[in-house]
């Protein structure tokens, strides 16, 4: 499948670059591509419900089982809209931001939504201290998604109580694991689980999602970089712990910057020399030093 999240990342990157450098000429050049990207994301809503539909393998977790209205893609698109609007200051974009924010907050955790997106599934949704990974026609995918939840913290979605409980959950999980970092998704899917066949068959070349590795509960420095970024203002000491953990993994084998690690054993997995592993450390470190980003 194609990658839905690349559009949002492009917009976030351009807007933050413009904000940092004040290179308005560059932004002017990129404005039309940005607007085309936002228009395409609107088209991928399919029924104008303010939630983008993402095919399986349609984002960074390209061999995982999430599909449908994936939470990570919704909050990433919201971040892109907010970044763009801080430069453009558009009433139209402001209204879209409000609608997208409302439908996210009302549908990805149990509560008192009067008009849930998936009424039958929402009725049986159990309360958890984090945002659900996805909604699709079959119901909710309720695993913990560290990347999506980290971006949600960055954007301050949910009320104070929800965010407090969210961080408590994430910290309890992080501290319970060998590497003292968050896994990409949790719990791992095992061969005896109902979803195993779906996971096992979703690979193009070779199967990498054994339990505790890759997207199936593996630890990614890049993902933890965004978690550290999201809590750096409120909990700088915790952010510092996470940065130290990221640097420890990146420095394996003479700074080989491995893609990810086995959460259970701590062994390096994935390919070497990944720029995104280095980027996770940089963004976490700079955030904890007071560097601000559009959000």
Could you tell me what each predicted segment is?
Residues 43, 146, 211-212, 260:
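N-terminal hydrophobic or amphipathic segments with adjacent small-residue motifs
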Residues 49-55, 59, 67-70, 76-198, ...:
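Catalytic cores of carbohydrate-active enzymes
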Residues 191-237, 282:
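C-terminal substrate/ligand-recognition segments
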Residues 1-48, 70-78, 163, 220-231, ...:
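Aromatic-rich carbohydrate-recognition surfaces in CAZymes
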